[in-house]
Amino acid sequence: MAIETLYDSDADLTIIQGRKVAIIGYGSQGHAHAMNLRDSGVEVAIGLREGSKSREKAEEAGFKVLTNAEAAKWADVIMLLAPDTSQAAIFTEDIEPNLEDGNALFFGHGLNIHFGLIKPAENITIGMVAPKGPGHLVRRQFVDGKGVPCLIATEQDPKGEGRELTLSYAAAIGGARAGVIPTTFKDETETDLFGEQAVLCGGVEYLIMNGFEVLTEAGYEPEMAYFEVCHELKLIVDLIVEGGIKNMNYSCSDTAEFGGYLSGPRVIDASVKERMKDVLTDIQDGTFVKRLVANVEGGNKELEDLRAKVNSHPIEQTGSQLRDLMSWVKNPLDATA
C-alpha cells in the first residue's frame, strides 16, 4: 500500500497564519523555518538564550528576538529546534512555565517526546514537522518555488487540531509543495536514530576507516587509500540519491559493479545484519537514550573521548592534506574558508 502523501491542496495555510509562532533556536533549521514562515505570512519571533551568538544574525534578518521564556509566553505555537541534548532543559526552565491552555509545542525530531524526556501538560498539542533535508536546502527550495518533503506527526491532540496544524505549518515552510508524509513520533525517532547509527554516520564512518586501515596496513600509500575508500564516496552517494542503487550500478563500470556484487556480501554479511538488529533494539528499548542522557549529565565526557579518538585517526591527517589540493572543496571547519 502506498504511503499517504499530502500536498498544498490538502493544507489550509490560514490555520498557521492565524497563530504566532516562536522558533526556539536559529541554527540551520531554525533559520529556514523562520524565513519561510515569515514569507508565508506567519507572525514569527525567535527565541534564544541570553548571550547567544545567533542573536545578531536573527536581528539582521529582521526578526523579533526574545529570550526563550519570552518567546514561549508570546507564542501560540512553539517550534523547539535547539539541539536534542539541550531541549529538556530549555523546556523545563523556559517553556513549560509559560505554556497556556491550547498552545502547541512542535519539534523537528521526536526523540525527547518519544522517550519521555519532555512531558508537556495534557492540554498542550504536541506535534512534529520534520523536513527531510538540511536547513539551507529547505530555504533554497522554498525561494525557488519548490519544497523539501516533510514528515508530520501528532503525539498529543487535546483539541483535535494536530494534523491540520502540523500540515499547515509544513505547507508554510514549503513542504507541501513536494509532499508531506504523516507518521508517528515513534517511527520517526527510531528510524532516524537507526539510520544515523547503523548506516549514515556510524556505519559509513567505520567502513571508511577500516577500509583505509586495510589498504595502508597492506603497504599502500595513505593518499591512495584515502582517494579509493573516502574521497570517491561522494560520487557514489550522489548517484544513489539521484536514482537509487540501480542507478549507481548502471553508472559504474562493469568491473566495479561485478566486484561489488561479489564482495559486498562478504563484507556486509548476515552477521552484520544481526548486529544492526541489536543496534535497533538498543534504540527501541531506550538503552541508547539512557547512555545519551548519562553522557550529557557527565559533561559530555564520553562524547568528547569518542570524538577525540576518531579525530586522531590517520585518515584525518591524510584527508586534510589532500583536500588542500582540491580548490572545489570547502572545509566547513575552517572559519577562514
Swiss-Prot record:
InterPro entries: 6-PGluconate_DH-like_C_sf, KARI, KARI_C, KARI_N, KARI_prok, NAD(P)-bd_dom_sf
Origin: domain of life: Bacteria
Disulfide bonds: none
GO MF annotation list: ketol-acid reductoisomerase activity; magnesium ion binding; NADP binding
Pathway involvement of the protein, from the record: Amino-acid biosynthesis; L-isoleucine biosynthesis; L-isoleucine from 2-oxobutanoate: step 2/4; Amino-acid biosynthesis; L-valine biosynthesis; L-valine from pyruvate: step 2/4
Enzyme Commission number(s) of this protein: 1.1.1.86
Main enzyme class: oxidoreductase
Pfam families assigned to the protein according to its UniProt record, in alphabetical order: KARI_C (PF01450), KARI_N (PF07991)
UniProt binding sites for Mg(2+) 2: D192, E228, E232
Reaction it catalyzes: (2R)-2,3-dihydroxy-3-methylbutanoate + NADP(+) = (2S)-2-acetolactate + NADPH + H(+); (2R,3R)-2,3-dihydroxy-3-methylpentanoate + NADP(+) = (S)-2-ethyl-2-hydroxy-3-oxobutanoate + NADPH + H(+)
Assigned keywords, A-Z: Amino-acid biosynthesis, Branched-chain amino acid biosynthesis, Magnesium, Metal-binding, NADP, Oxidoreductase
Gene Ontology biological process terms, A to Z: isoleucine biosynthetic process; L-valine biosynthetic process
Cellular component aspect of the GO annotation: cytosol
Cofactor: how bound: Binds 2 magnesium ions per subunit.
Record-annotated KARI N-terminal Rossmann domain positions: 1-183
Binding site for NADP(+): Y26, G27, S28, Q29, R49, S52, S54, D84, T85, S86, Q87, G135
Binding annotation for Mg(2+) 1: D192, E196
Family: Belongs to the ketol-acid reductoisomerase family.
Protein task: Involved in the biosynthesis of branched-chain amino acids (BCAA). Catalyzes an alkyl-migration followed by a ketol-acid reduction of (S)-2-acetolactate (S2AL) to yield (R)-2,3-dihydroxy-isovalerate. In the isomerase reaction, S2AL is rearranged via a Mg-dependent methyl migration to produce 3-hydroxy-3-methyl-2-ketobutyrate (HMKB). In the reductase reaction, this 2-ketoacid undergoes a metal-dependent reduction by NADPH to yield (R)-2,3-dihydroxy-isovalerate.
HAMAP family: IlvC
PANTHER family, alphabetized: KETOL-ACID REDUCTOISOMERASE, MITOCHONDRIAL (PTHR21371:SF1)
Name used for this protein in its record: Ketol-acid reductoisomerase (NADP(+))
Species annotation: Corynebacterium aurimucosum (strain ATCC 700975 / DSM 44827 / CIP 107346 / CN-1)
Lineage: Bacteria, Bacillati, Actinomycetota, Actinomycetes, Mycobacteriales
